[in-house]
A protein has these predicted regions:
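Short, glycine/charged-enriched secondary-structure capping and boundary segments
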Residues: 9-10, 64-67, 93-96
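C-terminal substrate-binding/catalytic lobe of Rossmann-fold NAD(P)-dependent dehydrogenases
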Residues: 145-273
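Rossmann-fold NAD(P) dinucleotide-binding segment
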Residues: 39-86
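Conserved N-terminal Rossmann-fold NAD(P) cofactor-binding segment
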Residues: 2-48, 57, 68-69
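Short active-site-adjacent helix-start/loop capping segments
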Residues: 3-5, 59-60, 87-90
């Protein structure tokens, strides 16, 4: 996989407002460079920011778990894009007893070496998938929403995220066919540690309810098949987050979520994984 990325770069396809067809962004046509390598060859201390973009159980894989140890030892600010908020991030929520949550993780010891002040969370709201008949360097965005990241504990580290936020906001993609385009997926930075937890309600009301005893169902059907049941699940999860200390404004209104879910005509990745 690394060889393909290094030889061909990456290709991301996404819908853009005002365009009938998907817009294809090829990394080879952009400034900067993209490099891929195997876990044992990565030196985290050489980077300004580490992004953990897999799901929590995958970090226990041989080679990857050793890399995670080096990331923690490096002291480099780390942003997780995971459905499951990692233990160091949960430790940043005032009053939350994280010791009782350790059984929820495949290998909780993996995260013990991280400084909570160096960990933040980014809600993985954009829906994307790898087309099954394409190479692994191709990604297709199904629902282009924004990434929502919480600030780091240290404003120096947060400034790096805010610079990324501003740079992405100002950037325009020069399409050979359509000229300068504003791409829809942004990075937004918030002061509240609860903003990335908005994903919890979406997962419980939609993604995980795609799982059925005999078959999967699309997220759209999971949410809209019984809209009031979905609303009840969604509002209950948001209520838990508010009881933990969040503000109602930290979370996405159910109506906005339900409207977005109506475009999700495939089962969630969690349902597909369980279905084998």
């Amino acid at each position: 996989t690394a060889a393909i990325f290094n030889a061909e770069g990456s290709t991301v396809r996404m819908p853009v407002r005002g365009q009938e067809d998907l817009i294809e962004v090829d990394s080879g046509s952009l400034p900067g460079s993209l490099q891929a390598t195997s876990p044992e060859k990565v030196a985290p201390a050489e980077f300004d920011l580490v992004v953990l973009a897999m799901q929590e159980p995958q970090y226990s894989a041989a080679g990857v778990r050793e890399l995670i140890g080096r990331v923690a030892a490096s002291g480099v600010p780390t942003m997780a894009i995971t459905n499951m908020p990692l233990l160091p991030y949960l430790a940043r929520i005032p009053g939350l007893e994280t010791a009782s949550l350790r059984p929820c993780f495949l290998e909780p010891e993996l995260w013990d070496a991280f400084d909570p002040d160096l960990m933040t969370l980014c809600s993985p709201d954009p829906q994307a998938f790898r087309p099954p008949d394409e190479k692994p360097n191709v990604l297709q965005v199904r629902l282009p929403t924004n990434f929502k990241a919480a600030a780091f504990a240290n404003e120096v580290h947060t400034a790096m995220l805010r610079n990324l936020d501003a740079g992405i906001e100002a950037a325009r993609f020069e399409s050979p066919e359509h000229g300068a385009l504003e791409l829809p997926v942004k990075l937004r930075v918030y002061d509240s540690v609860f903003v990335p937890l908005a994903k919890w309600a979406m997962l419980m009301a939609g993604n995980y309810r795609c799982v059925r005893a005999e078959e999967m169902r699309p997220i759209k059907d999971a949410v809209h098949g019984d809209l009031e049941a979905s609303r009840a699940v969604y509002d209950w999860v948001v209520g838990v987050c508010i009881e933990l200390g969040g503000d109602a404004l930290d979370f996405v209104p159910f109506e906005k979520y339900a409207n977005a879910a109506s475009a999700l005509a495939s089962p969630s990745s969690a349902a597909r994984a369980l279905a084998g």
